[in-house]
Amino acid sequence: MHMPLPGAGYVLGNKDVLPEITKFVKSIDPDIVGLIEVDTGSIRSRMVNQAERIASDLGMNTSYETKYGSKSINQMLPIVRKQGNAFMAAPRVHGEKFHYFDTGVKRLIIELEMDEFAVFLVHLSLKYRHRHLQLRKLYDLIMETSKPVIVAGDFNTFWGENEIYLFLRAAGLTSANVESLPTYPSRAPRKELDFILYQEGIEVTAFDIPHVKHSDHLPLVCDFEVA
């Protein structure tokens, strides 16, 4: 799920959205939740760590980190330095790792290792060249993983799945969104920017893109089993 980042409310965000997001996530009753552009406690969120607040309200664990590399100038900027990505998971889930791309502004990769599979959460660059360098790094991480892999997040693919076709083939990944339905913007979706991708060994049993407008991106909901 892509957390809201409204331009007009960047300095002081809409405090009413967080309870609505929590209510929506609770209605799905998920085992794992990925959050993109989560605020970890800036003035925009009124010093509330959104990942911790949602996880606490749902009785889940959370792992989060800023989406910028340690040497990025963004680490020095108010508000921006508190923007990150997060996993929320049931208490039995553990074993997170943080990786960083070598290029782009948004560099964070969160890896969540389960007993039978691994999940990578990403937010790729807006720049085409940087995205494809990031995909190369992501491919290397996937190849180092001995378990079936799920990759999810905001890929910023303005050409949709066609832009990552070769990456999918090379990594043995399939999109859960078989109809290539658009996910952005939520008010009138036209672009497929967000993906849940999975390898052989994972069986998707259900997939949905609920039309809720708590964010500028629509959320992706996927049920799966380990084959």
PLM regions with names:
Residues 38-117, 208-211:
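Structured beta-strand-rich core segments of catalytic domains in phosphoester-bond hydrolases
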Residues 34, 118-121, 150-151:
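Structural recognition of the beta-strand scaffold that forms the well-ordered cores
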Residues 93, 97-100, 113, 130-133, ...:
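Metal-dependent phosphoester-hydrolase catalytic domains
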Residues 1, 38, 124, 153-155, ...:
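Active-site metal-binding loops of divalent metal-dependent hydrolases
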Residues 47-51, 133-139:
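Charged helix-capping and loop-helix junction motifs
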Residues 1-8, 85, 111-125:
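Active-site-proximal beta-strand elements of phosphoester/diester hydrolases
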Residues 1-57, 64-72, 227:
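N-terminal, active-site-proximal structural segment of metallo-dependent hydrolase catalytic domains
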